[in-house]
Amino acid sequence: MKINLSNYTWEEVKDLADLDPVILLPLGAFEQHGKHLPLKVDEFMVNKIAIESVNKSHDKNIKAVVAPVIWTGYSPHHMDFAGTISIKDETLTNLIIDIVESLVKNKLERILILNGHGGNIAILKNVGQKLKYDKNIYIATSSYWDFAMKEINDWRKSELGGINHACEMETALMLHMEENIVKKNKIEDNPLKRSPYTGVDLLSGGAVGVSASFKELSPHGVIGSPSLAT
């Protein structure tokens, strides 16, 4: 079984549907990640993780295929930094619904949307509700880090506030996936320090949500401690 749906012909997709595979749909973003990481981080990493996950599933005789990555997402909070490309929440909602409906029409119905950007999470929850109640289509959604929270906590070196954006975790993943593109000499730390009632870290969701642009929180686009990444 081929890993990427894009490598199938239409005849092969008809045969693929008979196998009832899991379709992994990666969802990323195209936005600033500090001075040391490229704009592609979210869409690049989630796509790599999806491909590797499907590859490992094949080793266990689990039928799964990766759909083409949705490379941009909801990132208005990063628009003060050059290069960010954001789409409206309703645009992203409709785009995902259209893609899911297309897959379902092709009898590819076991769909997991794998997210790689925090700004997409609320939209994904809404998409799942709309598909269920408006279209009677069931999907699963998750962010890749949700599968590894314990492991992230075990290997992290930073204190609370060190894993957020362009942080220890994302920098470590990019060092593993494409080290030559990381500008190590440009790394700057900026651990978030604010009320404990608001979330300051991937592993510490706060009780209170407060919207803010990244420019208000960081002069260079980093929230966290990327210098500790290995």
Language model features: what each stretch is:
Residues 1-110, 118-230:
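Extended, histidine- and acidic-residue-enriched regions that form the cofactor-binding/catalytic faces
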